Amino acid sequence: MIERGKFRSLTLINWNGFFARTFDLDELVTTLSGGNGAGKSTTMAAFVTALIPDLTLLHFRNTTEAGATSGSRDKGLHGKLKAGVCYSMLDTINSRHQRVVVGVRLQQVAGRDRKVDIKPFAIQGLPMSVQPTQLVTETLNERQARVLPLNELKDKLEAMEGVQFKQFNSITDYHSLMFDLGIIARRLRSASDRSKFYRLIEASLYGGISSAITRSLRDYLLPENSGVRKAFQDMEAALRENRMTLEAIRVTQSDRDLFKHLISEATNYVAADYMRHANERRVHLDKALEFRRELHTSRQQLAAEQYKHVDMARELAEHNGAEGDLEADYQAASDHLNLVQTALRQQEKIERYEADLDELQIRLEEQNEVVAEAIERQEENEARAEAAELEVDELKSQLADYQQALDVQQTRAIQYNQAIAALNRAKELCHLPDLTADSAAEWLETFQAKELEATEKMLSLEQKMSMAQTAHSQFEQAYQLVVAINGPLARNEAWDVARELLREGVDQRHLAEQVQPLRMRLSELEQRLREQQEAERLLADFCKRQGKNFDIDELEALHQELEARIASLSDSVSNAREERMALRQEQEQLQSRIQSLMQRAPVWLAAQNSLNQLSEQCGEEFSSSQDVTEYLQQLLEREREAIVERDEVGARKNAVDEEIERLSQPGGSEDQRLNALAERFGGVLLSEIYDDVSLEDAPYFSALYGPSRHAIVVPDLSQVTEHLEGLTDCPEDLYLIEGDPQSFDDSVFSVDELEKAVVVKIADRQWRYSRFPEVPLFGRAARESRIESLHAEREVLSERFATLSFDVQKTQRLHQAFSRFIGSHLAVAFESDPEAEIRQLNSRRVELERALSNHENDNQQQRIQFEQAKEGVTALNRILPRLNLLADDSLADRVDEIRERLDEAQEAARFVQQFGNQLAKLEPIVSVLQSDPEQFEQLKEDYAYSQQMQRDARQQAFALTEVVQRRAHFSYSDSAEMLSGNSDLNEKLRERLEQAEAERTRAREALRGHAVQLNQYNQVLASLKSSYDTKKELLNDLQRELQDIGVRADSGAEERARIRRDELHAQLSNNRSRRNQLEKALTFCEAEMDNLTRKLRKLERDYFEMREQVVTAKAGWCAVMRMVKDNGVERRLHRRELAYLSADDLRSMSDKALGALRLAVADNEHLRDVLRMSEDPKRPERKIQFFVAVYQHLRERIRQDIIRTDDPVEAIEQMEIELSRLTEELTSREQKLAISSRSVANIIRKTIQREQNRIRMLNQGLQNVSFGQVNSVRLNVNVRETHAMLLDVLSEQHEQHQDLFNSNRLTFSEALAKLYQRLNPQIDMGQRTPQTIGEELLDYRNYLEMEVEVNRGSDGWLRAESGALSTGEAIGTGMSILVMVVQSWEDESRRLRGKDISPCRLLFLDEAARLDARSIATLFELCERLQMQLIIAAPENISPEKGTTYKLVRKVFQNTEHVHVVGLRGFAPQLPETLPGSDEAPSQAS
């Protein structure tokens, strides 16, 4: 027997009050005992959290005992955790004796919403010796331990051999593993399944009858029969598809003749017009080529006559172009002269402003020094006046208030101390430890002399600094000039670079003076170069016309040769009349042969089209008529073989269909009569009892029962006897077995199991030996497996049958096509190709035409050579006078050399213009660059040191001065003497006040006078700065304007510009004079050419009209060809046999087809409109659009699920083959797919009966359950009256409602819904569709009503409701219901799980004190009988003698809260035993 899985322990890590606690769980009942707040609910919450880690469901309410003095510390999940990492782990062992630890890592998330982060995990392969607390904690010392985070736990487990650690990202994966390993009873695939499981656990935890469960008992107890629903849905989908296909076939059959007629007439209509246009295009193209040849010849003649005119026009154009260039050059020279004059004026202004700026710069520097000195003196006067003002104010305030004077006298005692401090400071600064107030005056003179000496030294260095600074400024000025000219450079290179720049400046000035002579020389050479280039152009033009290059020395000889050639050509005469006549005679013979071949070509093309179609259909190539006849014999043999194979496959397919239908019967009955007999006898088919047997056990039970596997199990055989009399409608052998269908087992036989066989001892003298069948059919799983394999085989057979049927009909049609070909085209199909011979003859005709054309061209070429020779002589007459210029090869080099020298001179002039002023300034001061005053820095350091020494001496003198000034303060040693001399004090204050006021007056006068002087200095400085800035800005504007002008303003620029302007004016006058002469000559030449032009104008007009016509036709034909190729209809329209018909015949053919098409498309608005538009003869592409529209229309009408091709012509050919076969096959398939209403009712009834039997089996387990006055609990299952009526009508009266089930417009679900509405018109269906209602009616659970009933005291059986029961009774009843649900889940999930696993069973019960001792004992008995574990909680020990009891006490020690746990196992059968580890106190992590 398979052992049931158990929960071994629960481990809490870092929970509120539990740092590291493991609760060993009893195999039956584990009791948590303790007062309010002890941690019972926290422990159960940890268990539930590890079981269902879904934050959307978890909600732990306060369920502690009412009236307790201490309130509950539970605040949901967040309040039950402590800060840091927390764990809740369940240690389990399943039926395979595998240890599995599942749990969750919890951690509080910071924030006001009090969230908790949960990570589920599982550990497999853990040794039994390892405790859960050892895994997740690390001992630091004897009193401290640390909780490991999840990543460290993972690393720790991975280091252990054979241990597997899995972390889950989804709760579904976590529960899937728990289900597969037998930890939970049901596979939780969705959030809805998890919600049901949590509601069950929650109902168990809080006790009582859960309304959430009792209201939806059907969802909890009755499994969903999804297989039946899916079978109905697949059946309806298949029927719908089948009917749609049949309808498409019927539509296609009705349209088949229309398709043929439409395609045939549309092809004749469009192809005739297409080929007519193709023929006309070829004729027009030939005419256009002939016109082009004639026009080309005429243009050549006209070109020869116009040569003179072109030559003169070219020369005139050259002079016109030269005149424009000369005018532009002349205008540019005038503008340049104006710019040079403007630039010279600007340069004079710039020089004046630069001189003014230099003078202002010197004055500005001097004024800055004056202002700085005046500011220093002003600051000293302000300080002296402020000190005098403060002293006067102080003395006046002392005299105004006598009491204040007394305070001052008291203050002088403080001044005495300050005098002593001043004396000490003077000793320190002056390094005089023996200094006294009396000797301070002597030392003061000494240090004042030292200060004077330091001041004189500083002034001397300051004077040296000024001198050095002057030299430094000159060096900087020269250095900056060098940088401005040369660019950035090192200071030590300034002297060498400056000398180089001065030497370069001299050279540049020398070069700048050569600009004008070089420019005049360049102008002269350029004029000669232009004449030379003109002569070279004439020579190049002559060589180009002659097609050969000539040297200068050869020109005179060539002139004589051309004159001799002209004489010879004028005397030669060509006579080729006889040759021309022979060529024309041969051309006429070829034309006659071509005409005869064109008459034979259409017949041959028709035969070839038929032959090509046969080759494409059969995939063979035929080279003779004998090949055709031999292949026809092979075709007949192949047809016979395909028919035989098709019949064999069809027979096997029918056999498979019959077997599938037989195995698909509900209840496993292969004979429908057995179902009726079972209902009649009040029994159950043996196959239904064993319907749930697994696929592995099916061979055994099939062999065990042998022929009696289709027996009927009846409660009493004696009651069946009377039914057997006269029984005829039954199988040949009917087996009856007596037994209880609800508790039937296989103990009716004595069986010995052998290897793949059994021996059944039916009686003492009768044994039966049965081997295990290779293909078992006993049980639903075995039948479904066999049906699945049969379906796969049927699909293969159906596909093979369809292929063979298509091949047979295709072969038959191919045979007919061969027969037609032999009768019509075999005589001419294998003759030679007439079109190939026509092409050869056309090639010869073209050669003859070319020969005639060459004969004419030879004569024409001789005339052209004569004209060319005359033109050559004329050109040489113009070239020979300029031979001397052509021989001068160095002229261009000399021009380039002079131009380069001129560029250098102009660049030098630009350098002088740009840097001349800087070089002039640099030349007088360049000597200062020889030595860089580097000692200027050392001088600055010495000056700074002397300033520091002077400041030190001044401080020492000031310190001694302060001592000397405070000598009077040394006499204030006695305060009483100071107070007694009040009158003397008053007099002294007045004297001092007069002195202070006099000093203040002097300071004010000095300050006022110096302020006026400083203001004058600042005004002068501001005036200088303003003048300097204004002139600087004007100078910059002038320089920018000069740069914008872009002209060098040197001394000779104006003269050069004026000379250049006069030269260009003279050249322009000469060119205008020559142009006038050429215009007069050209006018005379054009008058002579007009006569020749009129002769050719008519020919040109005719040619262009024909060319325009050809181009227009070509554009339209290109659009037609593009449309034909894009739509793939060229093969249909380009019918080569039509090319040999005349235009009238083709037009007549197209008109006849048009009349037929008008009748054919009269009912189709779209095609009618397109046909009407295609009748326009000027728009041939519209006929193609009509043909494409016809093809598109036919493609849309042909269903791709019937005919898989895009070509309507091919589709029509395949259609005739497929339609009859598909119609027959689909009709039979619809009959097989349809299911009768009686079968539906039987399926639903059998399912309801099976589930009622299962509920009765569950009720048997609760018969002896009693809680208080409740003596028993049961589930009552009834069929709803309205649904029972529906089942009766479906099985008995379905003939009356065949209008619903035989309708093609309604699916079976919709027909079932309509029937339900017809039977129950009083029920409001709301907004639900008939399809939705029908699908609900196919679910057997909607036919049942379930409720929980209890047998309570004298009331008998009544509905279980919380209001009618006491608290303890409600808890016990609810627990019974939950046990029933868990057991039902296990039965439902048995197929999905391994057969060797029995899942864990565990429920909760909080606050179990509400149950009495008898109810507690009942719970214990129920747990023992059902092998179920139970965790209960109560304030006191309920039954310590049974199960395992934990006593929980919450304590506070040193501000640390923990729960003290003591565990006891049941002591009824043995002495009490303290559980291991119950005394250890929890440690807190430091």
Swiss-Prot record:
GO terms for biological process: cell division; chromosome condensation; chromosome segregation; DNA replication. InterPro entries: MukB, MukB/SMC, MukB_hinge, MukB_hinge_sf, MukB_N_dom, P-loop_NTPase. Pfam families: MukB, MukB_hinge, SbcC_Walker_B. Disulfide bonds: none annotated. The keyword Nucleotide-binding applies. Its main location: cytoplasm. Keywords: ATP-binding, Cell cycle, Cell division, Chromosome partition, Coiled coil, Cytoplasm, DNA condensation, DNA-binding, Nucleotide-binding. It is found in: Cytoplasm, Nucleoid. GO terms for cellular component: cytoplasm; nucleoid. The keyword Nuclease does not apply. Residues 326-418, 444-480, 509-603, 835-923, 977-1115, 1209-1266 form a coiled coil. Gene3D superfamilies: 1.20.58.850, 3.40.1140.10, Immunoglobulin FC, subunit C, MukB, hinge domain. Belongs to the SMC family. MukB subfamily. This is Chromosome partition protein MukB. It comes from Escherichia coli O81 (strain ED1a). The lineage of its organism: Bacteria, Pseudomonadati, Pseudomonadota, Gammaproteobacteria, Enterobacterales.
